[in-house]
């Protein structure tokens, strides 16, 4: 059974998980490694089962925890060109982690099918439609300016 779980949300940090069984993906990581790791552990999730991290945009409440988390857990990071360029230029993603640009069509992220779509915000921002291994579809869009 697939689930969408908000680990934390608000102006101090945002992070969510979509999981099917033990397999999962993370969306954004706006708080430190301790907070995120504790939340994942509380859910019984092992980092080895994570397919990667989807990033919606560059604001600190969505990426503040990435650098330290990725140093300990070198996962692939997915997103739009503008956001990945920002993360790379600012040293947020270590060289040991792959940056993978999503094009807008459905692409495989582990066992999940992910489609990126643009959203309205003051910096380039995207949402994600996630097709799970058990044939469910979930959509996440954060920090929406206008619908």
Tell me what each language-model feature is.
Residues 1-43, 126-142:
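Conserved beta-strand hairpin/beta-sheet module of binuclear metal-dependent hydrolase folds
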Residues 7-8, 17, 44, 67-69, ...:
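Short secondary-structure boundary/capping segments
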Residues 9-10, 29-30, 80-81, 103, ...:
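Fold-independent oxyanion-binding glycine-rich loops
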Residues 12, 59-63, 84-86, 124, ...:
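Active-site environment of divalent metal-dependent phosphoester hydrolases
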Residues 18, 28, 57, 77, ...:
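Divalent metal-coordination and catalytic microenvironments
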Residues 21-23, 71-75, 92-96, 110-111:
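Short glycine/proline-enriched coil/turn segments at helix->beta-strand junctions
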Residues 33-79:
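Active-site metal-binding motif and surrounding structural segment of the metallo-beta-lactamase
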Residues 80-134:
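Metallo-beta-lactamase
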